[in-house]
Amino acid sequence: MYFMNLLTTIIPILLAVAFLTLLERKVLGYMQLRKGPNIVGPYGLLQPIADAIKLFTKEPLQPLTSSHVLFIIAPTLALTLALMMWIPLPMPHPLTNMNLSILFMLALSSLAVYGIMWSGWASNSKYALIGALRAVAQTISYEVTLAIIILSILLMNGSFALSTLITTQEHIWLILPSWPLAMMWFISTLAETNRAPFDLTEGESELVSGFNVEYAGGPSALFFLAEYANIIMMNALTIILFLGAHNNPMFPELYTTNFMIKALVLTTLFLWVRASYPRFRYDQLMHLLWKNFLPLTLVMCMWHVTLPIILAGIPPQT
């Protein structure tokens, strides 16, 4: 029974990832005044399936000088962690209802760094290693602000469980009282998932493809799946934290519909940002975080701590 629950979570995620790649290619195509994929199937709808067959039937080449065990473990770990992060997400019912679900997600997102680091190191290629070092520095840096923003939101929520955020946002979305946090959160999620304009790790112009440059076929596809699963997961988390959909216990499917429409809008926003902005320079990327976002998030966190204490003595207004 538990195995079925797991499958009914994993298979839709992988399908969503497959069609997100098609959506991205279509959206970017139309933004660049071309059609995008339109050969395989009607309107190119079977393109993701063709891509999957092509990638997983190719020979998974390995450099002779690479560390063979780590070389295979790294992409597997990346995808496993990306899928595990979906476990505590309430949509409206999580796969496992944890008391400390947000801490579980933060711990897993920190572990995901190891997959990237191992892939760069195990490839035994200078380009892959430079890409991996950039990715690790970027991911670890932006996790700091993500954690502080989450802490500020949880101070308003009063619990570490994500499911209570649905109740918290019954009357007002948290994006309205905490819009500066929401703006910094969105930009940090772009950086955390290595998306343009923060795709320093891929840096086609200087690093060929970044940490996965030596990967071909199946293992390369696993990294690809992990990246896109993380994008959808981050958007889902954004909705739970800031744009909570009202959950009517009589019609739980309405919650899921509402949730997925918002997720689609946010994902399209990710693609729009990719089509519109050039890549940041590495020092600009770090300055944005350490000089701008970190002080601002710390101030906002202190504000959320002190505000309830300041207002505690005021009698309720009628």
UniProtKB/Swiss-Prot annotation:
Pfam families (alphabetical): NADHdh
Key word Magnesium present: no
Molecular function per GO: NADH dehydrogenase (ubiquinone) activity
Alphabetical list of InterPro entries matching this protein: NADH_UbQ_OxRdtase_su1/FPO, NADH_UbQ_OxRdtase_su1_CS
Cell location: Mitochondrion inner membrane
UniProt entry keywords in alphabetical sequence: Electron transport, Membrane, Mitochondrion, Mitochondrion inner membrane, NAD, Respiratory chain, Translocase, Transmembrane, Transmembrane helix, Transport, Ubiquinone
Catalytic activity: a ubiquinone + NADH + 5 H(+)(in) = a ubiquinol + NAD(+) + 4 H(+)(out)
Membrane-spanning parts: 3-23, 69-89, 102-122, 146-166, 171-191, 222-242, 253-273, 294-314
One GO BP: mitochondrial electron transport, NADH to ubiquinone
Broad EC category: translocase
The keyword Kinase appears for this protein: no
EC numbers for this chain: 7.1.1.2
Record PROSITE patterns: COMPLEX1_ND1_1, COMPLEX1_ND1_2
Recorded topology in the membrane: Multi-pass membrane protein
Family membership noted in the UniProt record: Belongs to the complex I subunit 1 family.
Functional summary from the UniProt entry: Core subunit of the mitochondrial membrane respiratory chain NADH dehydrogenase (Complex I) which catalyzes electron transfer from NADH through the respiratory chain, using ubiquinone as an electron acceptor. Essential for the catalytic activity and assembly of complex I.
Subunit structure comment from the entry: Core subunit of respiratory chain NADH dehydrogenase (Complex I) which is composed of 45 different subunits.
Protein name per its UniProtKB record: NADH-ubiquinone oxidoreductase chain 1
Organism encoding this protein: Cnephaeus nilssonii (Northern bat)
Gene: MT-ND1
